[in-house]
Amino acid sequence: YSQYLVWQDIIRDEYYIVEAVGTGIHITTLAALALHNDYIAAVRPIFDASKISQAIEATLSLLGREYDFGLNYYSDVSYVCSALITKAYLPNETWSVWLHIELERIATGIVYPPNSLVRKMAYDQLSQRSELWFVAFVDAREKDQRSFFSCEQQFLLSWKRSRLSFFLD
């Protein structure tokens, strides 16, 4: 999974995404994004429009920053995909409502993996304290070499998949 900020250009009928990849933080189209990802999911935070607007502004201010190959969530110099989005929804001087996340150690880095966001959504839904709404999930079957829209239930179970699941189908 990757995490992105999405908006639509209604004049060109195109969706744009802010993403953090090896070349850094930049804007790409949804079509280009789909070419280099096995799975794509869209979720929305359950915040009011002003908070979402502030998060978008915060994310756009990071365009051009480097990718965080060191996996240091606490860095404000470079970012991985999940940090790019989750940091935009952390508490700041203008709001105290934020996404509640628990960072994880992976190898020598501290990160918030995208699968953890999916796991959080699954557990939050069970406890009826969701902070995120499901929008869409594009799943894939490597065996059939195809992608397809899948349901919320499959998305919420997807965090349990092995990273090698597309080889095992």
Regions found by a protein language model. Give the residues of each.
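Residue-level detector of flexible, active-site-proximal loop/helix-junction positions
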Residues: 24, 49, 105
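Generic structural signal for short, flexible, solvent-exposed coil/loop and linker residues
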Residues: 6-7, 31, 56, 106, ...
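Activation targets extended, charge/polar-rich intrinsically disordered C-terminal tails
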Residues: 72-169
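Long, low-complexity intrinsically disordered regions
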Residues: 34-95
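Glycine-rich catalytic cores of cysteine/serine-nucleophile enzymes that process amide/ester linkages
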Residues: 1-43, 67-79
